[in-house]
Swiss-Prot record:
EC number(s) stated in the UniProt entry for this protein: 4.1.1.20
Organism lineage: Bacteria, Pseudomonadati, Pseudomonadota, Gammaproteobacteria, Enterobacterales
Organism for this UniProt entry: Buchnera aphidicola subsp. Baizongia pistaciae (strain Bp)
Name listed for the protein in its UniProt record: Diaminopimelate decarboxylase
Sequence intervals crossing the membrane: none
Protein family (similarity comment): Belongs to the Orn/Lys/Arg decarboxylase class-II family. LysA subfamily.
SUPFAM superfamilies with a match to the protein in the record: Alanine racemase C-terminal domain-like, PLP-binding barrel
Amino acid sequence: MSGLLKKKQRFSCNDILKIVSKYGTPLWVYDSNIIVKKIKELSQFDVIRFAQKSCSNIHILNLFYKYNVKIDAVSLGEIERALISKYRFTMDQDVVFTSDIIERETLNKVVQYKIPINIGSIDMLEQVGKISPGHNIWLRINPKFGHGHSKKTNTGGENSKHGIWDINLAFPYITKYNFKLIGLHMHIGSGVDYCHLKRVCKAMIDQVLQCKFKIHVISAGGGLTVPYHCNDEPVNVKNYFFLWNKARKIISNYLNRPIRLEIEPGRFLVAESGILVSEIRVIKKTNNRTFILVDSGFNDLIRPAMYGSYHHISVIPRDGRCVNYDDTIEAVVCGPLCESGDVFTQNEYGDIKTRILPNVQIGDFLVFHDTGAYGASMSSNYNSRPLIPEILFKDNEFHIIRRRQTMKELLELEINCI
């Protein structure tokens, strides 16, 4: 049997067969070696801050802690995950809370632990200031333009809810509540190209020139591209750093002080580390289509249904036979949900697309590649389906880092309520 198609993971098809025989399908598998490799690729930046929303398992966070990667949290739940994953909020801004809205319970938590807040709205400044004057804050700025691999991942411009539109409106509140302004942050979307990157760097310089307070840090945000297609070019990290470092030097010279440069990636660090393994349960034909139905759906991996995202798919035969790449079929790959949109091979407009795959049999496994980011963290219980296991390949061993949710656990919040 051939190894995994597409690249990267250090484990083999035989390893996957052993895992599914023990834990069943569907399931997630991550390779820690790839995560560590991606961390090292960003070593030129002063601070790497992981966008936890992309993959929030506490054992993944423990791995980041080991390599001195800090955390960006966007909810109370993510703050709690960071706390249980060894991060200490009093230690050199280990955790920053980023949001455009802050609920009362979350506000109480960030005040309790003195967590710096990356503030994305003027109303938040007032709400935080009344409870915690003198708090350490960042300002998230909307540079009035954005870009992403999908309209839904564009986080800048007048159609985006994210960030402060006019930085000048923030200054009276900073003075009124004696906030300590640490830095400025910009993130215009997921999947940023170099043309837009240059605009962001210039926009950051312009915002600092407007700022009435001397900051210490600038954040490049995230958005580094990931090569989901086999022929995609990986992002040039050196060029990415060069552009931001150039902006940092201009800002440092203007403020006459050292400026720390942070980057806040999510997908870049974890996407390529993960796979989703599913079993083929049905192969059906219509006049013009062949449909392959697997036991995972958009309740597990929602990116194709939500964004039209592409994930490379490879085949692992259940019986260990060799894959014959000369004997192929053109098929639509779907999940089990009672939902027409539960299709893994569709574009951003919802148009059904086919994928050329080796001829498969019932019981074979499909592997969806590059699902380490926004896979498990965006999964749900839709159709009352339990959350699936997560497995981490670390130190040449496979470790279960989330067991399969039981039906009892799924129903527990509702039983005995009345």
